[in-house]
Curated annotation (Swiss-Prot):
Protein name per the record: Probable nicotinate-nucleotide adenylyltransferase
A Gene Ontology BP annotation from the UniProt entry: NAD biosynthetic process
EC number: 2.7.7.18
Reaction equations catalysed: nicotinate beta-D-ribonucleotide + ATP + H(+) = deamido-NAD(+) + diphosphate
CDD domains referenced in this protein's UniProt entry, alphabetically: NMNAT
Length: 214
């Protein structure tokens, strides 16, 4: 059975234990051989924060140092460019075999507005969707719900048997840490060392990254 590669995109502003522990849990449960962290400098569906992409990348590198599960992709890091998942997946598929199983990891909260993503139906032509639990408000969209229902599988082993096209809902624990909460903690002088690796905490304090309101 082929092992999966997975892409985990996000702002990572900052990267924290919620990201890292979730990724490691998914890798263990579903036999993911490599997780590619995909920091997005200019996400199309959320407000851009003040942290520079170079600082985000540095924090990611510090957090995953000597962890062979992870690597970083720089495909969505160009300054002032808006990046869309479908375009990034096409670029990634040009670099890896079209026969290699690939997952794109997103939270249930983002799945609720997935129909707003560029060419959202085409994403399954390039990868599976691996959904992790996240608190969210239910949004009704019949077209999206039918699409999810028709492509969802309940056996994670099926993700290894074809390169793309399936949706799988993980039963990983719900993440109760958010980057926005951590940024606010630093702004108000609250300690966040338990929420992220100490080396990342030290970098934030050294650079005074979140001392202005974001």
């Amino acid at each position: 059975m082929k092992k999966l590669c997975a892409i985990f995109g996000g702002n990572f502003d900052p990267i924290h234990y919620g990201h890292i522990n979730l990724a490691e849990k998914l890798a263990k449960d579903i036999s993911i051989k490599k997780i590619i962290l995909l920091p997005n400098n200019y996400p199309p569906h959320r407000k851009k924060t003040q942290t520079s992409i170079s600082d985000k990348i540095k924090m990611i590198k510090l957090a995953i140092h000597n962890n062979p599960l992870f690597e970083i992709s720089y495909l969505e890091t160009k300054k002032n460019n808006i990046f869309y998942t479908i375009d990034t997946l096409k670029k990634i598929r040009k670099k890896i075999s079209h026969l290699e199983p690939l997952c794109f990891i997103i939270g249930e909260d983002n799945l609720q507005t997935f129909y707003l993503w560029k060419n959202w139906r085409e994403i399954l032509l390039y990868s599976h969707l691996l959904i992790y639990p996240r608190k969210h408000k239910k949004q009704k969209n019949n077209e999206l719900e039918k699409w999810i229902h028709s492509n969802t599988v309940y056996d994670c082993n099926l993700l290894h048997k074809q390169p793309c096209g399936l949706i799988f809902f993980s039963d990983a624990p719900c993440i109760n840490i958010s980057s926005s909460r951590i940024r606010k903690n630093y702004f108000y002088g609250k300690n966040s060392h338990s929420l992220l690796p100490s080396i990342v905490n030290n970098y934030i304090l050294l650079k005074k990254l979140y001392y202005t309101n974001q």
